[in-house]
Each structure stands twice: as structure tokens, then as C-alpha cells.
């Protein structure tokens, strides 16, 4: 890593990557968010909305990149909750999507844990790193949001966590 790279709590962002992110945010698709930890007092991750299609009411969450100190924390879950809440309640979308490489077991597990429903597999959907990539599709739709939101709110209550931020009840 050169001296011109930015390190965000373990996430390396080079000037080229920063230029790319800035250019993408000016178009609004994808639209990136920085994830800040109040507990750690630092930025720990990135996530974005992409494939934003207001004309048909669909939006995807992706480019999710967490530093090790954000992974598997209540803050990581809360960040995903806030983005989902904004997609449905703030922006008025009817469908919220999550897609990932079918080989990415952690991403698929995260999608299911966060309340997304598995929809299927697009075989050879793209070419990635000189190989065919099968893409797993997940979604939450507006009719499911009210119930899912209640689950998130119960999970995120401070009474659900001990002093070390370990949860008592799962999402």
C-alpha cells in the first residue's frame, strides 16, 4: 500500500478508488454511504444503493464493505436496517434487492439473517475474475417491511445487548 492510500479503519481506499466513488455519487447510481461507528468514533464501512429504478420502484443495496471492527456487530445490522428503512419509508420503493456471487456464503447468510428472501440463481449471470459467476438473488418487498421493521426494532433495543454489545436474542 502506497502513502497515497487512505485507510478507513482497515478499509484501504486509494486515490483512484476515491475518485471513482466521488464520480459515482455525482450520478447518484450507485449512491454510496459511509458507515460511522459512534462506539468506535471512526468510519468503519461503506454501502451503497445501486440499480436504482424509481420508475418501477426497485433499488438494490450493495458494495457493502465492512472493516473487521464493524463485522458482526449491532452497528452493522443497524446500518442495514437504516438503509432498508430509508428505501421503503423515505424514498418510497416497493422492492429492496440484494445480489451476490453464489460462492459468497457469508453474503448469502447475511442476506437471509437480515430478512431478505432467496429468490433464485441467475446462472452465468456475468463474468468475474475470468470465470462465470452465478448470481444469487434476494429481496424484501414493501408488503413484508412492516413485520420485518418490528423485528429489527426489537433486536436493536439497548435491552437486547449486554455491556459488551453481545445480543441476548437473535434478529
Model-derived regions, located:
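GNAT-family acyltransferases
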Residues: 1-73, 86, 90, 131-171
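Glycine-rich acyl-CoA binding loop
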Residues: 76
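Flexible ATP-lid and adjacent glycine-rich G1/G2 motifs of the Bergerat
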Residues: 83
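Conserved GNAT acetyl-CoA-binding A-motif
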Residues: 89-99
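Conserved beta-strand-loop-alpha-helix junction that forms the acyl-donor binding cleft
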Residues: 98-107
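Hydrophobic residues within well-ordered alpha-helices
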Residues: 110-111
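Conserved catalytic-core motifs of GNAT/GCN5-like acyltransferases
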Residues: 117-131
Amino acid at each position: 500500500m502506497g502513502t497515497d492510500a487512505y485507510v478507513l479503519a482497515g478499509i484501504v481506499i486509494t486515490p483512484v478508488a476515491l475518485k471513482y466513488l466521488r464520480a459515482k455519487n455525482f450520478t447518484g447510481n450507485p449512491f454510496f454511504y459511509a458507515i460511522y461507528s459512534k462506539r468506535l468514533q471512526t468510519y468503519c464501512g461503506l454501502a451503497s444503493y445501486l440499480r436504482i429504478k424509481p420508475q418501477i420502484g426497485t433499488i438494490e443495496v450493495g458494495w457493502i464493505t465492512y472493516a473487521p471492527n464493524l463485522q458482526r456487530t449491532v452497528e452493522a445490522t443497524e446500518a442495514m436496517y437504516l438503509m432498508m428503512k430509508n428505501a421503503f419509508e423515505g424514498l418510497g420503493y416497493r422492492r429492496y434487492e440484494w445480489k451476490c456471487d453464489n460462492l459468497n456464503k457469508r453474503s448469502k447468510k447475511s442476506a437471509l439473517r437480515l430478512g431478505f428472501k432467496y429468490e433464485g440463481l441467475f446462472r452465468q449471470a456475468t463474468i468475474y475474475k475470468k470465470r462465470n459467476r452465478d448470481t444469487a438473488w434476494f429481496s424484501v418487498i414493501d408488503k413484508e417491511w412492516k413485520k420485518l421493521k418490528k423485528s429489527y426494532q426489537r433486536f436493536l433495543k439497548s435491552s437486547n445487548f449486554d455491556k459488551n454489545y453481545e445480543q441476548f436474542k437473535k434478529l
